[in-house]
Amino acid sequence: MQFAIYAAAALFEIAGCFAFWAWLKLDKSPLWLAPGMVCLALFAYLLTLIESNVAGRAYAAYGGIYIIASILWIWFAEGARPDRWDVVGACTAFAGTCIILFAPRS
């Protein structure tokens, strides 16, 4: 369940940020900002659902999921194929996420 929350949070964060990107960089209508802000609020809410005793750990673990989701966004939403360094970087970040999520805690 935690992974699904992280994945949904990443989707909402990327979509929200992309709405601002589209408005400022792609000359889209300011109307893009309304759904962008809703997406960013949903992103923040979803991260509060993560089971963690400290917020920073939840955010740190989320970082690797966000990077992978961003690489997928490049490919599927923007139509650009990630290069090998994108993939290597995403895999490295995901390894860090796994360490944070699954390390034994006292």
UniProtKB/Swiss-Prot annotation:
Disulfide bonds: none annotated. GO terms for cellular component: plasma membrane. Keywords: Cell inner membrane, Cell membrane, Membrane, Transmembrane, Transmembrane helix. Pfam families: UPF0060 (PF02694). The chain crosses the membrane at residues 3-23, 30-50, 60-80, 84-104. It is a multi-pass membrane protein. InterPro entries: UPF0060. It is found in: Cell inner membrane. HAMAP family: UPF0060. Belongs to the UPF0060 family. This is UPF0060 membrane protein Oant_2511. It comes from Brucella anthropi (strain ATCC 49188 / DSM 6882 / CCUG 24695 / JCM 21032 / LMG 3331 / NBRC 15819 / NCTC 12168 / Alc 37) (Ochrobactrum anthropi).
